[in-house]
């Protein structure tokens, strides 16, 4: 049994606690989206080798240790997490851990229709679906020729039927690529109870061809949407929430904006990321990870102690200093640590 560490909250060098864990369960993905895992840079069979992947036992021990040092929110990512064999079994084990207040999953939605019921029954509480276009040909193109929008929409419908009533729908907007999909997406999801969120194109990884000119800022997107459907700002749901929330003035739901490039939120970042092979990344824009497997072999107690030590020296604030920083190390790819 791990000791109660609530009396001594863990903080990094800037006084930021650790509350949110993004845990990748697999590196493989069935899509090849250009801003994450472009087909010309990543082979089709990438990430399918399970030799280095943490087992379910290891993942449960890891999550228990993170809970012991303050984590209350857990999100499963990939790659595409629904490719992980027997994922509902893992979710059932993680959902049973005392202290986990929110258990969510991010998916491209292509496999969601066949798994939605099992995910709900296992204890998954929330789902986020990535969707960068509604137009079928553009959606297929942006997924590297792998995705069909009808499959994703069917997955969302199946999730609703399974009991997931308030999904988040994430759209990464790139200038001259899918800008014209913004208003159609808003029109489609307004009034459904789901929350559409627009994410600025970020310089995560080194193979997505990022350049500042390709960024459509949240302010620009908000103005476009507001001109069609008036918006009013909402307060954050919790400290460290990444999306700026706005309600539709007519009461038909809300829309969110994630502004990592134009309005950095490093100051409130309470998130850590762990890759499928057990490496800790304390920032989405990190250039290298820290292997947790040796500490994991010591069990919950040993790993919890190790995590406290690692977090106490954390000083990441890349988005705040992006303009004045020249990278000398290759940043980790998004598909290794999720979004």
Swiss-Prot record:
Enzyme class: lyase
Binding site for S-adenosyl-L-methionine: 35, 79, 130, 202
EC number: 4.1.99.22
Annotated SUPFAM superfamilies: Radical SAM enzymes
Catalyzed reaction equations: GTP + AH2 + S-adenosyl-L-methionine = (8S)-3',8-cyclo-7,8-dihydroguanosine 5'-triphosphate + 5'-deoxyadenosine + L-methionine + A + H(+)
Family (UniProt): Belongs to the radical SAM superfamily. MoaA family.
InterPro entries, alphabetized: Aldolase_TIM, Elp3/MiaA/NifB-like_rSAM, MoaA, MoaA_NifB_PqqE_Fe-S-bd_CS, MoaA_twitch, MoCo_biosynth_MoaA/MoaC, rSAM
The name this protein goes by in its record: GTP 3',8-cyclase
Pathway: Cofactor biosynthesis; molybdopterin biosynthesis
Residues binding GTP, per UniProt: 22, 75, 106, 168, 271-273
Origin superkingdom: Bacteria
Required cofactor(s): [4Fe-4S] cluster
GO molecular function terms listed in the Swiss-Prot or TrEMBL record: 4 iron, 4 sulfur cluster binding; cyclic pyranopterin monophosphate synthase activity; GTP 3',8'-cyclase activity; GTP binding; metal ion binding; S-adenosyl-L-methionine binding
Function: Catalyzes the cyclization of GTP to (8S)-3',8-cyclo-7,8-dihydroguanosine 5'-triphosphate.
Binding sites annotated in the UniProt record for [4Fe-4S] cluster 2: 266, 269, 283
Keyword 4Fe-4S (UniProt): yes
SMART domains: Elp3
Keywords, alphabetical: 4Fe-4S, GTP-binding, Iron, Iron-sulfur, Lyase, Metal-binding, Molybdenum cofactor biosynthesis, Nucleotide-binding, S-adenosyl-L-methionine
Keyword Metal-binding: yes
Assembly: Monomer and homodimer.
Residues reported to bind [4Fe-4S] cluster 1: 29, 33, 36
Occurrences of domain Radical SAM core (ranges): 13-249
GO biological process: Mo-molybdopterin cofactor biosynthetic process
Bound cofactor: record note: Binds 2 [4Fe-4S] clusters. Binds 1 [4Fe-4S] cluster coordinated with 3 cysteines and an exchangeable S-adenosyl-L-methionine and 1 [4Fe-4S] cluster coordinated with 3 cysteines and the GTP-derived substrate.
